[in-house]
């Protein structure tokens, strides 16, 4: 039995490599005046590594990542342009139970992102068995759109034979067109995945300029970077109870002056974020400022404030005032895209 599994696993990997090569040839056969161009939604359970995968595929850090679930709250685009294709990725929040008004709106975003796409990438953690929550998440996929199963984190799977029953179970749940094992964190299998994706896209003209990376305004990126700094420095429930509002944005030739308010639900959360003598807020600010300077390629003066807005995740008026899709004020104007 063991020998049979080893042989099957070997055949699986060999087949994937051969298929990727064939798809590469198929892509390269497209006339250079045309490219394969289309929209690809990235879906999956929380903590499957969707945002890490998006960053790895695009080659830039445009989505926040952390070791906690539900770090992505909105769907947004990352664009990969190669000589053969232009792929517009739509990252989405993790598919999960909608237990708050904010989460219900997030799931509305997911459902919208799974409609009218050229392809869906369903990303799963290859180290985890299929659970009831996974089955429910897969059932949310649109069967009228082709989907590729992406088995992420394979660098953590020592026995690759374990991938076979995982693939089999997922293909029983949904008619996935293909299965591709990758490690987004280790950049393994990404070229193969890009070839697979492009092979399903139609020929067409470029939708965005070749140097275009994301559709998100700089204010959104700043708010997300602050939220990621909170996620990386503060544990437990506090990060998920935060909404970031960029209050002011001033730009000169030498620096950016940015002020943002971190909204939390309880006084205790505010105390945790500020920390002893303001040390935690200072740490969060430093983490965010360094990342912002990397993004903006300029000095950044960042001011952070913490305010209590009780039960904001269930407050429709607050969610409407503070655009829940971007965590920015409704009066904010979009800046030039990076």
Residue ranges, per PLM feature:
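Conserved G1/Walker A P-loop phosphate-binding module
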Residues: 30-108, 112-114
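Residue-level signature of catalytic and energy-coupling elements of molecular machines
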Residues: 43, 47, 53, 76, ...
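Conserved C-terminal guanine-recognition region of P-loop GTPase G domains, centered on the G4
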Residues: 108-177, 252
